[in-house]
Amino acid sequence: MSSDPIRIEQRSRAQCGTFWPLHWDYLVQDMFDETDTEADRAYFCSEEYRGAVECAMARPANRVHQVFFHRGSQHIGCAQYVIYQDEGGKCLIMDFWLFPPYRRQGAGHDCYWALEQAARDEGAAWFAINYHSDGAHRFWRSLGFADDGTDEYGDPLMRKG
């Protein structure tokens, strides 16, 4: 594994076209399971969802951020997050993933620390994320997140800070 630092590339709304195919692959390969309905799967892979997120990227407040993680010259993963200043600086990590060749080597931790610092620089005071697998739960706990009940959809929620 390279010791190069993680670089975060913020994607603008105009640049997000390259994000969506990667996001859809991530959802299909890593996120969807037997608890997700066909309607859920269709929505999160739809132009409707994409349009809603892209509109949220243009909001003046509580704007969605799409980022690419780079180590050296390699694009190793992606994330989406939003900082809610009207909720005490809550940073909701909507999506966070590394491409399979870069997993289980410490790069996920490095990417999270880079994302946390970037979000704190933008006003984040605390962090929240949903998880959908035991492995994801262990990963987020290893970064200092603690269980925080469920969200409005009944999905398990974790919090840090």
Model-derived regions: residue spans:
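Short glycine/proline-centered loop/turn elements that form peptide/ligand docking sites
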Residues: 108, 112, 133-136, 153-158
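Acetyl-CoA-dependent GNAT
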Residues: 10-89, 94, 99, 118, ...
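Conserved acetyl-CoA-binding loop-helix of GNAT-fold acetyltransferases
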Residues: 98, 104-117, 142
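Conserved catalytic-core motifs of GNAT/GCN5-like acyltransferases
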Residues: 128-130, 141, 146-160
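Conserved GNAT acetyl-CoA-binding A-motif
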Residues: 119-132
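Short glycine-aromatic motifs
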Residues: 6, 62-64, 145-146
